[in-house]
Amino acid sequence: MKKLTAFVLSAMMVLSLAACGAKTETPADTSTPAADATKPAEVAKLTYAVEAGSAGEEVALANGYNVVSVDSQAKALMEVQADAAIIDSLMAGAMVGEGTSYPDLTITDQKLTEELYGVGCRKGSDLASFINSVMADAYADGVLEATAETYGVQAALVEQPASEFTASESDSDVQYIKDKGTLVIGITEFEPMDYQDADGNWIGFDADMAKLVAEKLGVEPVFTVINWDNKVFELNGKGIDVVWNGMTITTAAQESMECNNAQVIVTK
């Protein structure tokens, strides 16, 4: 298993922390707390921008940091509302540096925790087993790593064990999806996992993997933007077939959805 370095954005280049970012579940038993929870003096003096309602906000508050809850951490830095921003390492790498929206921000390498990213299907769905088999084959033949390299997340990949698809004996979700001819993928915009290119096409590591699964199913991929808080409702109501958008695999997620084997480990 490879681990990705954690990041924090810092306008003043004084300190770095990293934590979870947009649209993820609250960290549970998949998270590893910081090795040293004691706040040094310089940490106590700083104000950190965190996404309102995110796991990053929860981790920061648990560590006793001064926070300002915002919709855009990087924007808060540029407007001098905060000294640093807590955000997950994948998103930080995509939005900071030359050629990005925030070229003047810097990234540093102290971490708070780690999370596993995966996919959520309807509870009891055999689609999770199908996805595991596709990911295992993609890992074995190098497609998974090549796709990860395209979006700069190769260091975060989790090794995929060999896996064979086991179809449900009755009420097969895989057969339902094949019969209707589409795989409806619930997403939010979360670069580098799911985002739109200049032509409005959905791309990203998760988006490309979802397209691969749709190809193996012999159906068309359909991306639909969802309200993240309603993802389980959307699944159960068959408005979508899968949640595939940098989703943290937590105990709560596993209780309400059928989750696949994690594909990415993200340092916070």
Where do the model's predicted regions map?
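Short Pro/Gly-enriched coil loops immediately N-terminal to beta-strands
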Residues: 108-116, 257-268
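Periplasmic-binding protein-like
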Residues: 56, 130-155
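Positively charged n-region of N-terminal signal peptides that target proteins for export
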Residues: 1-9
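A ligand-binding cleft/hinge motif common to bilobed small-molecule-binding domains
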Residues: 58, 78-113, 230, 246-256
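Hydrophobic core
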Residues: 13-17
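A bilobed periplasmic-binding-protein/Venus flytrap-type ligand-binding module shared by bacterial periplasmic
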Residues: 113-134, 268
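Bacterial lipoprotein signal-peptidase II cleavage site
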Residues: 18-28
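Extracytoplasmic small-molecule ligand-binding "clamshell" domains
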Residues: 29-42, 50, 57-58, 63-72, ...
